[in-house]
């Protein structure tokens, strides 16, 4: 997934000079416990909180997912497998998907990407704009200003996100003091992700005291040695 980086920068909240770089496979699976013991939860949370996700765009699929070595030694390309699975399941191609949403289809590769190099690369792979796979088309779409991904994916995201919330009784009909207790409702009203993190990991306080949304990248704390 383009959001997942290949490499991670591990920071120390109490030592701005310490910066270690780890590849995804260095901290994935069974290796994760050793990484947690080595750096501790506070520094790992700080490192992940200050990191930025990858852009949802072409040429940004993680390298390790394209050359993933399984436990049996077989190397697989998950990017190619995703395309193959979509085709096997009958997922509509990009233009047909747009039409099913009552949206105008792309008339050409240039119309899809607004990028001449990307359009040429797509033309080298696909015989027609109608052949472009949905995932490829979604990654090729230029996002509107201020958006993290293109118009087509955003429309589906809005539908799915709102449906998940509206279909969960604990967010709707049972979001009441009777279900959560008055004390529970007070905790919900007076806390957010930042306060939850700081309550369990107090050393994160300096990194989060100005953060209004802990799910967005946090600011990196300045190095006192370089401040004047």
Q: What residues fall within each predicted segment?
A:
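Terminal regions of secretory-pathway proteins
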Residues: 1-228
